[in-house]
Structures are given as structure tokens and as C-alpha cells.
Amino acid sequence: MNRLLISSLILSSIGNSAVAGNASKENHPNIILILCDDMGFSDLGCYGGEVRTPNIDFLAEEGIRFSQFKNTGRSCPSRAALLTGHYQHEAGMGWMTAVDEHRPGYRGQIAANIPTIAEVLRDNGYATYMSGKWHVTVDGAFDEPNGSYPVQRGFQKYYGCLSGGGSYYAPKPVYSG
């Protein structure tokens, strides 16, 4: 009796894992990653802030919150670390995008050999979209794609500005095609 029960459980679990394996490829969980510049840790309601942020609080409650992320004093090194999962120097963004210092950790953009989360997700069947400030392409590379634009680093669609600062009233557009 025990052999039959154990055999049934093993066969059942193999069958279930095969079905689950096929289903997971078709039903990827949705991933929404929000990065806000110039915001304090406790500015959001879900982190104890005084400002009401019910929609973000809902996403935080139903999803995953990062509470142990290394943040630099500058936005683009933090952005590069978040997009790649590497320390900013490993990703090529040790400082800012203002200049390519021709040193491996200070190229002013994400290194070509370091994959972004968008590239990994895209290659695994996800649709990848980004909106907002990119700010991980070296300044001066905005007129001609140089391999570091969002659509060249895994995002299928991108709506935003490439540089770190600018005017929402007079943005510098980048067009596809």
C-alpha cells in the first residue's frame, strides 16, 4: 500500500510540475518597476509617509518592495545598478553621464557586455516598456544611436527623455525610424 501511495505521489508531482512548467512560460507574472528621483524613503504611504499614495500603496501591498537596495548620491549610477543588478562601477556608470572618462567603470553609460533587466526579460518572453528618464547614455550621444538607447538595451517601446535634466515644456525628441 505504501509503495502504491508513494508511486502515485511521485507520478502526480511529476505531472503537476510538467504542467506548471508549461503554464509558467505562458503566464509570466507582471512586473512593474517604479524608480522616482529626488524622493525620500518615507515620502510614500507604504513606507510610513504622510502623503497619501493609495495606488502605489496598493502595488506595494500586492507586490514586492525593495528595502535593501544600495543607492548612490547620484541618480544615474543608482539607475544603472537597478537596471543591471551590478554595482554601478561594474556596469560602467561610476559617476555621471556627463563624460566618457575612458576608464572601465566610468564610461558614462551601461557597458555593452552587461545585460539590462529589460534584455533578460525580453529574451524570456516578456513585453518590455519604459516611460520616463533614461539617463544612462553618455551626454552627446543623443543625436545618433550608439547602442545605449533604451530600445537598444531591451526595451521594445520607450517614451521619455534620454538625458538627466531638461524641460518638459521644450523636450528634445528622439524618434524611432
What is the predicted function of each stretch?
Residues 4-12:
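Sec-dependent N-terminal signal peptides
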Residues 12-18:
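C-terminal segment of classical bacterial N-terminal signal peptides
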